[in-house]
From Swiss-Prot:
Example of a GO biological process term: transport of virus in host, cell to cell
Organism: Potato leafroll virus (PLrV)
Keywords linked to the UniProt accession: Host cell junction, Host Golgi apparatus, Host membrane, Host mitochondrion, Host mitochondrion outer membrane, Membrane, Phosphoprotein, Transport, Viral movement protein
Major localization class: host cell
Protein name as it appears in the record: Movement protein P17
Amino acid sequence: MSMVVYNNQGGEEGNPFAGALTEFSQWLWSRPLGNPGAEDVEEEAIAAQEELEFPEDEAQARHSCLQRTTSWATPKEVSPSGRVYQTVRLSRMEYSRPTMSIRSQASYFSSSARPLPPPPAPSLMSWTPIAKYHPSSPTSTSSKLRRAAPKLIKRG
């Protein structure tokens, strides 16, 4: 069983779920994984962070990811592999420039009888906006067009 809990793009302002998501993520990350009475417990934790800068746009992008996997021995009747694996991950991304800021946060939890392949990590290059901001030039209008008065059409 695996599920993505929430993905919030667009920041926390005006989002009624933002506070609940933060609380849930903190709760999920602080929970002890695994079976408290189990023997032969193995745990692995990974923390990663990357940053990109776009000087031409005065923009920055950041991604941080925390992941913890716990496994423990279990009877073959419970799990054919003889182990149970639980993984929890918290991923946060942010893109900001002088005119905008985008934040995204996702929590992930899985529990399985065999180690699951890690889902693809989000890439900052695919996540950051690809369209660059180009201020539009003012449209030019002819002076004759600006002075023209509307014409009335009579129907009779």
